[in-house]
Amino acid sequence: LLLGLLAPFALHDILPKFDEELTVYAYEKIWSELSELDRKIVYIISQGVNKTGDIRESLGVSPQLLNTYRKRLMERGVVDGSRHGELTLALPRFEEYINMYCEVTI
């Protein structure tokens, strides 16, 4: 029944509105509350760098420092660290938000 209701709408028709709602009601607030290093880590992940060793190397930080930020970002639900040695974004379409609206200097 639900599929029948959604059938007239193509995904490309509803994604812009979905992205706008995520941006206005969630992602702007989440991004504004991240520290500078949090933002750099999340930005690097959004660029496809997922291995913690590569993230550390990109930022020039120690394993201990990255681990502190990793834990904090996981607790906030921003990143997923369930796979050993890897970090991914946990929020739907957050990568698109970052690439569209956020400027980060590494």
Model segments located where?
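Amphipathic alpha-helical "lid/sensor" segments that cap RecA-like P-loop NTPase cores
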Residues: 1-24
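C-terminal leucine-rich, beta-strand-based interaction scaffolds used for sensing/assembly
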Residues: 23-106
